Amino acid sequence: MVGGDTYSLNADRWGTLWPAATAIPFYKPIDGQRVITYFNPLYDNYEGYDHAVKVEHNYNVLTKQVEDLTAENESEFGNDPVWVNKDMMWIGGGYLNVIFRQNLPVKEKHLVSLVRDKWATAAEGEDDGYIHLEFRYNTYDDVTARQANGAVSVSYTHLTLPTKL
């Protein structure tokens, strides 16, 4: 964010972007907010930025940390079905980014989480040298037949990665 309603973007794949033009003049940027940005590139190497772009739309993305899954809290995270296309998951900017298809709620906000399964590893009795992550979704039994895409970016930078790869 530069100041006021003026902002720049640090893109996962495109580097730094300067919104030289926009189709969304009333967008209010929030410093540090991850967004999915639809844009058209205008210029390369523009005044210290990698690209100048025309922003067509910004979608704010939910950001979270990896949470620990245990026997005590497993029901809190739920295990309801949600559709994730493998082509709609990527790593960038220190985040695992996931776009998923969900049945929308009637009134209760759903919970989406990426959890580290410490319970399963402890139950097996030995550490296999891997971090076990699960994408969990809790509808709280509040769904409609109406579907929509959702997006979440989960920071993994606080995880201690195994040395065995």
Where are these regions (language model features)?
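Beta-strand/loop nucleic-acid-binding surfaces
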Residues: 14-26
